[in-house]
Regions:
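Short aromatic/hydrophobic contact patches that present stacked aromatics
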Residues: 3, 82-86, 117-119
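Conserved acetyl-CoA-binding loop-helix of GNAT-fold acetyltransferases
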Residues: 93-106, 132-136, 140
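Conserved GNAT acetyl-CoA-binding A-motif
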Residues: 108-130
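Short hydrophobic/aromatic beta-strand or adjacent loop that forms the aromatic wall/cage
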Residues: 51, 160-162
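A short beta-loop-alpha structural element at the N-terminal edge
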Residues: 3-15
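Acetyl-CoA-dependent GNAT
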Residues: 32-90, 107
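Helix-loop element at the rim of GNAT/NAT acetyltransferase active sites that forms part
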Residues: 17-34, 47
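Conserved catalytic-core motifs of GNAT/GCN5-like acyltransferases
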Residues: 119-121, 135, 139-159
């Protein structure tokens, strides 16, 4: 049975194992280098000071995680967040992301968050680094496109339109 729980700093290595292929093989994240376990641990700790950071676990194995963070660094944005979600690539399409996001959104609602944003990479013609899987997932979850930043990211010697 899949369980959702709050992430702990000691989950860093398991979460990093899920995240690393997104860094090295995709333009889903614009991060170029895989962070160290210590850096990832620090990210978890910093996020948990204010926002939820959830993991999906089955049989003591973490299969995915989702968290919220600062949308913009100004006080007027305090009731808005940016979300991120990563599911182990071999487990995609199994409903884990939907369960994680539903749980994350419930916690955010309890915290008084009014606006949940997902900043998603987009490319008109999918390639080996970027597909429409994330935008399609977010649309399925009820997210609506509200902006488009043109030629905003550069990774793998390709300008990603974002």
């Amino acid at each position: 049975m899949l369980t959702i729980r709050s992430a702990k700093p000691q989950d860093a290595e398991a979460l990093l194992a899920i995240y690393a292929p997104y860094v090295t093989d995709t333009a889903i994240t614009f991060e170029y280098d895989v962070p160290t376990a210590e850096e990832f641990r620090s990210r978890i700790e910093n996020t948990l000071k204010k926002y939820p950071y959830l993991v999906a676990e089955k049989d003591d194995r973490i299969l995915g995680y989702a968290y919220a963070g600062v949308f913009k660094g100004r006080a007027a944005y305090d009731h808005c967040v940016e979300t991120s979600i990563y599911v182990e690539q071999s487990c995609q399409g199994m409903g884990i992301g939907k369960i994680l996001y539903n749980a994350l959104e419930e916690v955010l609602k309890q915290q008084g968050i009014l606006n949940v944003n997902a900043c998603i990479s987009w490319i008109d013609t999918p390639n080996e680094y970027l597909t429409h899987q994330s935008p399609d997932f977010h649309a399925h979850m009820g997210y609506e496109k509200v902006a488009h930043f043109h030629l905003c990211g550069y990774k793998f010697n390709i300008t990603q339109p974002s």
